[in-house]
Amino acid sequence: MMIEAYFSAIVFDPCPTCPPGLKHPLTLQGRIGVIADSHGNIASMTDCIQRLTDRRADTIIHLGDIFDSEIHHNLMNIVDVITDNNILAVKGNNDYQIEKSLENGHPMDLDPSDRQRIRQFLHSLALYFTSGNVCFAHSRPFDSIRAFYEPIDTGSTEQAARIFRHTDHHLLFCGHSHLPMLFRWRAGIVTREPIPEQTPLVFQKNEKYIIIVGSADKGECGFIDREKMVYERIRL
């Protein structure tokens, strides 16, 4: 699909209760594991962490929807898994809904100390962060609530094309949509492509990419080698 000129402005509402994207880029080198959309499934999340640890990932990043807004048990255990394994994370829409429920006094059968710790954990999550020309977000890499609610993959390349036009990221890794998918910008053309399980994706300097990792709840995660500039889809 050829990218056409977009004349309408994209306006994102402010998100006063959410930390925006981190303004100081992180320094992430070497091997990076990525997980998304575990939706409260501790078993799947820990399986992904173990698989990425076995691959000697230097850093593991969770791309949001750590929790599920309809599943309220094991919230503290989920926080412990993230913090005990030094997982970096961004906020997803389900995480935001849990945060707002706690702020609004929903009991969720939690001890007061656990409630406070979960709230602090959720409030600390940024909407996205960058490392060099690489960005990590739940969905769209912008400072608004809409950004983590609206999917990039709508079955077409329209939303991906807008992100390529409005950002300078070489690579964007995200979740929200549960099916692994690649959007590629090459010489003004955006394509939507499935991500194969067995063939590593080699990144080219003259292209830009959006990688939707897929849902850990459905057995998906990914592995990035920044030195070799490759991405591998991992299916549990």
Task: Mark where each language-model region is.
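Core catalytic region of metal-dependent phosphoesterases/phosphodiesterases
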Residues: 6-12, 25-31, 35, 40-123
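Conserved catalytic scaffold of divalent metal-dependent phosphoesterases
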Residues: 73-74, 79-173, 177-187
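Binuclear metal-dependent phosphoesterase catalytic core
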Residues: 26-29, 190, 194-236
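Active-site-proximal beta-strand elements of phosphoester/diester hydrolases
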Residues: 30-39, 133-140, 210-214
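Short, acidic/polar N-cap/turn motifs at the starts of alpha helices
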Residues: 22, 124-128, 200, 221
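Divalent metal-dependent hydrolysis catalytic cores, especially in the metallo-beta-lactamase
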Residues: 65, 177, 181, 215
